Amino acid sequence: MAEGNKGVGPILRMSDDIDGIIQAIRDDNPDKEIRVIDRHAYVRIEGDPPLLLTRASIENELGRDYPLREIELLMSSFNGVMDSSNSDQFIWTRKNI
């Protein structure tokens, strides 16, 4: 992550799917450093914008269908601006897309 640059990304409540979601974010952003801050009850996941998360990557990691609305139920908050207009992906950035 760039020095002095606050990352963007989801803040998720702890669940059985967290490890798969984290790996899916890493898979979707292979050239970015992904920082994970575990606060026991929740996990903050962040990287330099834009940060992408696709349904295909989550399904690949978890081995099952995974509608993105399930992420919305886990997401207590997020850093940055989140574009959820596509049912197959989320993008976090600093500006409106």
Predicted regions and their residues:
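Conserved N-terminal glycine/acidic-rich loop preference
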Residues: M1-I22, D28, A41-E61
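Short, solvent-exposed secondary-structure boundary motifs
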Residues: I21-N29, R69-M75
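A short linear hydrophobic-aromatic micro-motif
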Residues: D31-V36
